A protein has these predicted regions:
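Short helices/loops that flank or line small-molecule/ion binding pockets
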Residues: 1-6, 88-109, 116-117
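Acidic, polar ligand-binding/catalytic clefts
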Residues: 1-53, 62-68, 127-131
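A ligand-binding cleft/hinge motif common to bilobed small-molecule-binding domains
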Residues: 10-21, 71, 101-131
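Ligand-binding cleft/hinge of the Venus flytrap
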Residues: 26-29, 52-56, 61-86, 112-122, ...
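Solvent-exposed, acidic/flexible segments
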Residues: 30, 84-88, 103, 107, ...
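Periplasmic-binding protein-like
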Residues: 31-36, 120-151, 155, 174-178
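Extended ligand-binding regions for polar small-molecule ligands
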Residues: 41-63, 136-174
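Short beta-strand-to-loop elements that line the ligand-binding cleft
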Residues: 79-94, 128-130
Length: 178
């Protein structure tokens, strides 16, 4: 029997389905990614403008070059020390050991990995700079009824406090800004 995916989590419109010409329904926003450029505070690096990323050793999440916009893409296009990787588990140690100047990650993912790697109370060792506006996340489905069911459930847990408990459980403290 052919397996079919009912739901995917995505932050880009129809990014998995646009070539198939299939109607895709997007849910309400589940949470926002807070993409930040993060460096060691003690290094006092300057990277307030996009062109500042052209000469730094940068480790970013996979597809950052596309997600972070054309100005960022231009800045890192000729940077031989720019890397994108799916595995964000290594980035905390790479940054802490000064093997990279900057990592680009959702702040909440970084903080979670930081606590797992280096223990609690280390977030103050780093500087967090906003690189783009928050990125809304939602689910995508080919089934309108499934989307509506999901939205009703999401609304309910947001209203009854369960949503906030989930954020705290999995992200310790969900931080909505860099």
């Amino acid at each position: 029997a052919k397996k079919q995916i009912d739901i995917v989590v995505s932050n880009r419109d129809n990014n998995l389905y646009f070539q198939k010409q299939v109607k895709i329904y997007s849910s309400d926003v589940t949470l926002n990614y807070v993409d930040c450029a993060i460096s060691l505070k003690k290094r006092n690096l300057s990277y307030d403008k996009m062109e500042d990323y052209s000469d730094k050793t940068v480790w970013a999440f996979k597809s950052a070059r596309e997600v972070l916009g054309s100005e960022f893409k231009r800045a890192v296009s000729s940077n031989r020390n720019y890397t994108e990787n799916y595995d964000q588990n290594l980035m905390v140690n790479m940054l802490a050991k000064e093997r990279v100047d900057i990592v680009i990650s959702d702040k909440n993912i970084f903080l979670n990995l930081l606590e797992k790697s280096l223990g609690p109370g280390k977030s103050g060792l780093f500087t967090y700079k906003k690189i783009i506006p928050i990125t809304p996340r939602n689910i995508k489905t080919h089934n309108a009824e499934l989307k509506e069911t999901f939205n009703r459930g999401l609304k309910q847990i947001k209203e009854n406090g369960v949503y906030e408990k989930i954020l705290k459980k999995y992200k310790n403290q969900y931080d909505s800004k860099c």
